[in-house]
């Protein structure tokens, strides 16, 4: 039926060229975006498997289509491994993304118009934590806590807002906070107002799975996450919970048929193998190195005179405030990009610019750690970042750093073995 020679390269040269160029970019650029990583060849293989052909609405053993006996095995493996990896009593592996996992959890826990208490976006939260431009801020009444003067979560403010607004859900989680969340303290705040306690560990899921960051799974009512980022799986979502049969039914219904139809079985299989990878001893070593590399980079940038929000990092990322440098995040991102160093601009506490410009950078170490970078390379890289930010319009400095970055990437290839 299909000719084995019918490759993308021979059939669609334009698309093949774009993919080839992206492959080269990933090999020759230093990736410092905290939410990005490099998946294993196993994860890549499964995302391109024949499981993409199978419709499987429903759950293992309870499908609306025939012929699901083998995809049932794949999904059940993913469920069982997720529960084991995170110490959960319940796992739903069907969410297509972290944002959808959040939407589905909200659907199970709230009605439209109910109040959600979560972290402010400019202080490190996420769009789906009640931003007015997101469904989470359109369908629910969002109230936000932030960071205190020391750069830590302002638990007193959160407790005060909880008493004032009596939210239905209190959410703890972040996309740009470099500290450790006191999950138990949030649990106590939620209990004080009879609210559900939900956590979003999208950024630290791999660290939680490896045991190098505290787990909220048996503290919160519901935990959501992505399966990429530090977990190093496919781009997708996951919902976890401690035992609560009634809530489990509501979560399942919120995913299907509440907001999704047929699950992506090829992605679910990729999740299953990623969870197995995260159970291996070397994954814990990897997670520990992520933390070491982030600390090394943050320390260098502090020594070079840059303001690190929260004073440093205790996880995989840190936020650099450029408010006192007369540099926008947009300018910094572009200059570093010309040097083959990929970062993302980010809003910071006290932000004065628009979200499209910003006054900060978010820097993360999951991807460089996957490549094999250790503290030596991380520190060296931080110095190069500072060299560019110190003289942001100096194209010679940018060119010099680009050459160094290219050489460093050559020593730590990502997928060269696949060529």
Swiss-Prot record:
Q: In which pathway does it act?
A: One-carbon metabolism; tetrahydrofolate interconversion; Amino-acid biosynthesis; glycine biosynthesis; glycine from L-serine: step 1/1
Q: Binding of (6S)-5,6,7,8-tetrahydrofolate: at which residues?
A: 121, 125-127, 354-356
What catalytic activity is recorded? (6R)-5,10-methylene-5,6,7,8-tetrahydrofolate + glycine + H2O = (6S)-5,6,7,8-tetrahydrofolate + L-serine
Per the record, the major location class is cytoplasm
Under the heading CDD domains, the entry gives: SHMT
Q: Which cofactor does it need?
A: pyridoxal 5'-phosphate
Q: Which InterPro entries match?
A: PyrdxlP-dep_Trfase, PyrdxlP-dep_Trfase_major, PyrdxlP-dep_Trfase_small, Ser_HO-MeTrfase, Ser_HO-MeTrfase-like, Ser_HO-MeTrfase_PLP_BS, SHMT-like_dom
Q: Which UniProt keywords apply?
A: Amino-acid biosynthesis, Cytoplasm, One-carbon metabolism, Pyridoxal phosphate, Transferase
Task: Tell me which residues are marked as the site Plays an important role in substrate specificity.
Answer: 228
Q: Which residues carry this modification: N6-(pyridoxal phosphate)lysine?
A: 229
> What are the record's GO terms for cellular component?
cytoplasm; cytosol
Q: Name one GO molecular function term.
A: glycine hydroxymethyltransferase activity
GO terms under biological process: glycine biosynthetic process from serine; tetrahydrofolate interconversion; tetrahydrofolate metabolic process
> Which residues are in coiled coils?
none
Enzyme nomenclature, EC number: 2.1.2.1
User: Subcellular location, in the record's words?
Assistant: Cytoplasm
Q: Where is the signal peptide?
A: none
Q: Which superkingdom is the protein from?
A: Bacteria
**What sort of enzyme, by top EC class, is this?**
transferase
Assembly information from the UniProt record: Homodimer.
Tell me the protein family, please.
Belongs to the SHMT family.
Do you know which HAMAP family this protein is assigned to? SHMT
Job of this protein: Catalyzes the reversible interconversion of serine and glycine with tetrahydrofolate (THF) serving as the one-carbon carrier. This reaction serves as the major source of one-carbon groups required for the biosynthesis of purines, thymidylate, methionine, and other important biomolecules. Also exhibits THF-independent aldolase activity toward beta-hydroxyamino acids, producing glycine and aldehydes, via a retro-aldol mechanism.
Name recorded for this polypeptide? Serine hydroxymethyltransferase
Organism of derivation: Coxiella burnetii (strain RSA 493 / Nine Mile phase I)
